[in-house]
């Protein structure tokens, strides 16, 4: 058994490779890595727009000052625990953070941030994401070895871009990769 060097990918972005993951939730997905340890990994897909919600109704915000719906996009973060919601947001908002990455991003999961967003007092940029993606120990490392994912540094412009459909293509361009040059064969050279 060989000893492998562990590379922590917390705060990085995973880019799904084309022709490898061709169907389902991970096809052309971008995942912001919340945590990556030798015990496993957790991330949020940030380019799977599924709907728009009214924050006031969804979070049952009881305030007569907000008279019109506050519509925000809702993203599917992964196949695990869809009943859990997270705000992936810029770090200019720092109340009751769940995670702070020190790379201008943070994660919150509380009623206070939804109220602050509804009142226009929330973070400059945010995504509301339900569910998350999780890997067992060694699983992500295996997927990386078989070229299912590319790794790039966090880029807020990709995360908070207006058009979720173009995020994946823009990430490839940022990496200097043209989709048509990918082989449909998997493995290592």
Swiss-Prot record:
Domain of life: Bacteria
GO cellular component terms attached to this protein's record: cytosol
PANTHER family for this protein: UNCHARACTERIZED PROTEIN YQGE, UPF0301 PROTEIN YQGE
Family from the record: Belongs to the UPF0301 (AlgH) family.
Protein name: UPF0301 protein A1G_00270
Taxonomic source organism: Rickettsia rickettsii (strain Sheila Smith)
Classification of source organism: Bacteria, Pseudomonadati, Pseudomonadota, Alphaproteobacteria, Rickettsiales
């Amino acid at each position: 058994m060989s000893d492998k060097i562990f590379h922590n990918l917390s705060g990085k972005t995973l880019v799904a490779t084309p022709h490898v993951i061709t169907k389902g939730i991970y096809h052309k997905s971008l995942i912001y890595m919340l945590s990556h340890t030798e015990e496993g990994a957790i991330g949020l897909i940030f380019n799977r727009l599924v709907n728009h919600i009214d924050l006031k109704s969804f979070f049952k915000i009881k305030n007569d000052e907000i008279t019109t719906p506050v519509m925000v996009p809702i993203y599917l973060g992964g196949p695990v625990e869809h009943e859990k919601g997270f705000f992936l947001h810029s770090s200019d908002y720092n109340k009751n953070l769940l995670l702070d990455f020190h790379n201008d991003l943070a994660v919150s999961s509380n009623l206070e941030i939804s109220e602050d967003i509804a009142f226009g007092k929330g973070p400059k940029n945010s995504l509301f994401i339900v569910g998350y993606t999780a890997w067992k120990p060694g699983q992500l490392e295996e997927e990386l070895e078989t070229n299912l994912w590319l790794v790039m540094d966090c880029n807020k412009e990709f995360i908070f871009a207006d058009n979720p459909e173009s995020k994946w293509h823009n990430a490839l361009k940022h990496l200097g990769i043209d989709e048509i040059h990918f082989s449909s064969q998997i493995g290592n050279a």
